[in-house]
C-alpha cells in the first residue's frame, strides 16, 4: 500500500518571508501552486493589465499584476490582475477588498478550481470576480452567489465606470 504524501505545514510568517518563484497561494498552512507561463494566459493577462492601466485616471483606480491579497487570516491569493480604488492606502500586501479581481483560466485548471479561488475573494468583500477562459473565449462573472457567462459585448462593474470589451480582449489571441 502506497503511503500518502505528507504536505508540510507552513506558517503565515514563513509564507510572507519566503520568496517562491513563481509566487504561490497560501491556504490554511498549505502552499498551492499557480500555473503561469502559457502564451494565451500571458497575452490575456497583459492585455487586461494594459486595458485597465489606460484608464487609471478616468476610472480612479490602481492596477496590479499578481499582488498578494490577504483574503482571510490564514489565506492569501494572488489574482492575475487586481483592481483597487485610487484612494487605496499603499501597502505591500492587499488587505482591504479590491474592487475587482481578474483571473485567466489555465487549461489544466478546472472552472470549479477557479471558482473556489473566486469565492475567497467574494467572501473577503470583493464586489466581483471576472474569470477569463482563453480556450472557450468566455468570461465568467461572479457576484455573490451568482455567476453569469459572457462571450461578447462589454463587461461592466456595477457602480463604477469600469468597462471591458470582450471581442477586443479575446482578439489578442488571434494576433
Indicate where each model-derived feature is located.
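Gly/Pro/Ser/Thr-rich low-complexity, intrinsically disordered segments predominantly at protein N-termini
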Residues: 1-175
